[in-house]
């Protein structure tokens, strides 16, 4: 650990398992938990929203592509998914900033709420959601490509199972076969993927948080790396 440069200054890890991470020796000496508490809340909040939005889009889209496998619409969605998956996050962010903040000035591009706003309660929540719209759109879009293809692959595998052929042979409606039988079998690997995503929530979205000036864990990482 000392060779990696991550050894604490006092050389001890006592208290880590109890959430006592010691002090942060930045411009001002503060307890680590005090430094990361608010950024952690922001990062978890925005990542959970982005995950929910992405799942709400990719699950029906992946099922549709699996059912319509080989069709023109499936091919079109797959091409779009590959393009979206291949583009770097900052390129997608720049494109959306140009589209929704410059060409069509709909959303703000930085901050988390209106500076000096007197909002409280529900208005404060709505104001923050308004400022989070563009980062959420970018994060959701960045997730669509990989997740859509994953759901599609899981559904195609489920639809080829013997139990699905048996269900169709019994004369069940196609909708029942897809959603009551195939989807249940395809759900297991998808749940595994989602759990992995939630574990990655705490790492923060470094690039997006930096570009949109969001006070999250991503910015904390950058500040820690660039501090003397």
Positions of the model-derived regions?
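Short helix-coil transition/hinge motifs at the ends and kinks of transmembrane helices
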Residues: 11-20, 25, 108-125
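Hydrophobic alpha-helical segments of integral membrane proteins
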Residues: 1-8, 21, 32, 36, ...
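Phosphate-coordinating loops and pocket residues in cytosolic domains that bind phosphorylated ligands
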Residues: 26, 78, 109, 179
């Amino acid at each position: 650990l000392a060779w990696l440069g991550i050894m604490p200054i006092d050389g001890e890890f006592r208290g880590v398992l109890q959430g006592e991470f010691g002090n942060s020796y930045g411009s001002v000496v503060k307890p680590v938990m005090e430094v990361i508490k608010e950024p952690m809340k922001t990062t978890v909040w925005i990542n959970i929203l982005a995950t929910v939005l992405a799942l709400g889009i990719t699950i029906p889209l992946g099922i549709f592509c699996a059912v319509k496998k080989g069709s023109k619409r499936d091919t079109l969605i797959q091409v779009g998914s590959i393009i979206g998956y291949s583009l770097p996050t900052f390129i997608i962010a720049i494109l959306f900033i140009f589209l929704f903040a410059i060409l069509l000035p709909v959303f703000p591009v930085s901050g988390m709420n209106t500076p000096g706003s007197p909002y409280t309660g529900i208005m404060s929540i709505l104001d923050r959601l308004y400022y989070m719209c563009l980062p959420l759109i970018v994060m959701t879009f960045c997730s669509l490509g990989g997740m859509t293809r994953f759901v599609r692959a899981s559904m195609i595998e489920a639809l080829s199972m013997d139990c699905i052929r048996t269900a169709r042979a019994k004369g069940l409606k196609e909708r029942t076969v897809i959603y009551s039988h195939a989807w249940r079998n395809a759900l297991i690997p998808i749940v595994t993927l989602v759990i992995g995503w939630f574990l990655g929530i705490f790492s923060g979205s470094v690039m997006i948080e930096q570009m949109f000036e969001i006070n999250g864990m991503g910015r904390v990482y950058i500040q820690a790396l660039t501090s003397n």
